[in-house]
Amino acid sequence: MRTHYCGNLNKSLAGQTVELCGWVNRRRDLGGLIFIDMRDREGIVQVVVDPDMKDVFEVASQLRNEFCIKFTGEVRVRPDSQVNKDMATGEVELLATGLEIINRSAALPLDFNQTNSEEQRLKYRYIDLRRPEMSDRIKLRARASSFVRRFLDENLFLDIETPVLTKATPEGARDYLVPSRVHKGSFYALPQSPQLFKQLLMMSGFDRYYQIVKCFRDEDLRADRQPEFTQIDIETSFMTSQEVRNVTERLVHDMWKELLDVELGQFPVMPFSEAMRRFGSDKPDLRNPLELVDVADLVKDVDFKVFSGPANDEKGRVAVIRVSGGASLSRKQIDEYGNFVGIYGAKGLAWMKVNDRAAGFEGVQSPVAKFLNEEVINAILERTQAETGDIILFGADKAGIVSEAMGALRLKLGTDLELTDTSAWAPLWVVDFPMFEEDGEGNLHAMHHPFTSPLGVSAEELQANPAAANSDAYDMVINGYEVGGGSVRIHNAEMQTAVFGILGIEAQEQQEKFGFLLEALKYGTPPHAGLAFGLDRLAMLLCGTENIRDVIAFPKTTAAACLLTDAPSLANPASLEELAIAVKLAEKKDA
């Protein structure tokens, strides 16, 4: 039906007759001529309809926004005075010789000239996606997927599919369950990742695997999460963690260069402990210059229990953030930041303004200064390298609360005070994660997943002191977003059984849930390691947006609903009966 895309017309086509298909972006009647801005996925071109072409002119006079149309015409170069430098096709226009209305459009439920609500945009997503901004994002995502396949194919990785209907395994979130009609009362689970199948592929001898795959997690959503999401899943045999990092870093480096013409450089590597100490996060945004500084040793002997208590608690932490020029913050602003850290469990936010650094103790202003002697204050000023005009903000509590609260405050200050360089790219690797983390009841949980190999310890050593072990795991972080995570996997049954035991999974449960894996580990399993990227998050960063819904064609809401199709919906009673399922809804309690 067409010979060219609207957005691809240029001066090299001058004098040629072309056929275009697309939509009316805008219609203007000027000086007896009709001008149509015609749009397709590649862009917009101006079409001129001359009244001398009576039949065409008559049809063109009926056009309204979003009519689906076909134009035939001659490409001609615009006079210099009429060149539109704001359009990629601004040097040319199409002189129409034929026009067909393929389909008319009703009045649009969205107005492209104003901001529409998120609900309306999702309900009429097929219209929202016509906007050039949205179309460009989906196209860039497609280019990213194509690049990944090409890169991995060239590096001898095999694209292998794994099952979607599989067995529920504990991977940190709730599973989406699918009832079996044949095996009544039994359920499949949609995969949270292809983790075990890709490990089994390594045991099968396919030493370089990849897959761009849908995964599913029934968890509470936020801006960078969806119930169904897309992973770039990678697994290798006979490669160390360093070698896996090298090839996947090169993938991202080359992707940014090809798609954005951005040179990322070599990614720095940072241990988990350093990331938490300096930034209060295992996915630090290195574009932000603010850092956490520990001062527990300086305040452990003061009479102020708010500081000395955590300073003398082995599970406590006292850390500060020095904000250059922050002494200009008002008391109201400081109180608002105090309320902000309260969201993360902090009991308050002590502060100290440095009005005159040269005056030392006499030059600071703080409600807690009276509890601190001159020696302590001078030591804090020295350690933080504070200068006149700065403010020092204090966090003192359990280490986890301080790290999370002050880490979040660091990000907020970076945004509010425009300290974060939003034009920069700051990738890094975070490595040497703890093997396990403790919940509030003292139970250990795998920080990544239970198939991650510990770093440099035997099964016996791990069992003797599991809380001290680190894992051979690694996360790729870009601008404060974890875009990929992976690890070396356990490749012998003894270590895997030991890890299950530490996690409180008894022998019988191990066999019920993971018997197939433990059996497979008996038969010459190679050492293997891998990584999975979140394609949605990568695309989000590439497109310069902050919400993965912007780079997914048909996303869900934060309530995991599809406003376009009204999913999820009630099932047909006959279907439920066939599956031997009865739905019992919780009764609403009277107020």
Curated annotation (Swiss-Prot):
Its EC number is 6.1.1.12. GO terms for biological process: aspartyl-tRNA aminoacylation. Keywords: Aminoacyl-tRNA synthetase, ATP-binding, Cytoplasm, Ligase, Nucleotide-binding, Protein biosynthesis. It is found in: Cytoplasm. Signal peptide: none annotated. SUPFAM superfamilies: Class II aaRS and biotin synthetases, GAD domain-like, Nucleic acid-binding proteins. ATP binds at R217, D218, E219, Q226, E482, G534, L535, D536, R537. One of its GO terms (cellular component) is cytoplasm. Residues 195-198 are annotated as: Aspartate. It catalyses: tRNA(Asp) + L-aspartate + ATP = L-aspartyl-tRNA(Asp) + AMP + diphosphate. GO terms for molecular function: aspartate-tRNA ligase activity; ATP binding; nucleic acid binding. L-aspartate binds at E171, R217, H448, R489. It comes from the Bacteria. Homodimer. HAMAP family: Asp_tRNA_synth_type1 (MF_00044). Belongs to the class-II aminoacyl-tRNA synthetase family. Type 1 subfamily. PANTHER family: ASPARTATE--TRNA LIGASE, MITOCHONDRIAL, ASPARTYL/LYSYL-TRNA SYNTHETASE. NCBIfam families: aspS_bact (TIGR00459), PRK00476.1 (NF001750). Catalyzes the attachment of L-aspartate to tRNA(Asp) in a two-step reaction: L-aspartate is first activated by ATP to form Asp-AMP and then transferred to the acceptor end of tRNA(Asp). This is Aspartate--tRNA ligase. The gene is aspS.
